[in-house]
Amino acid sequence: MKHLISMRDLSADKTLQLLKLAERLEKDPSQIDLSRRVMAAMFYEASTRTRMSFESAMKRLGGEVIGMVGTSGTSVEKGETLADTAKIMARYSDI
């Protein structure tokens, strides 16, 4: 799976798998090294806590974050679709 948009995108087995992995990584975060990795984050609506938690987690794991909040100053204002914007962001990021 490349993108997780909704919990409905996950089967019950996959959800359980992810929860077990999260539990293991929570006990020993040194297993994760995201240095030299870039995460793209696109927030079309204000979501301060969610955005900050994603950015904080990525930075704590050694990675960087690029992104956008809202559509002001983006090509969306010129008519670019969400899908096109997501494709471009994916080219500039690893996650």
Ranges and model annotations:
Residues 1-56:
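Positively charged, low-complexity intrinsically disordered leader regions
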Residues 34-95:
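Phosphate/diphosphate ligand-binding glycine-rich loop within oxidoreductases
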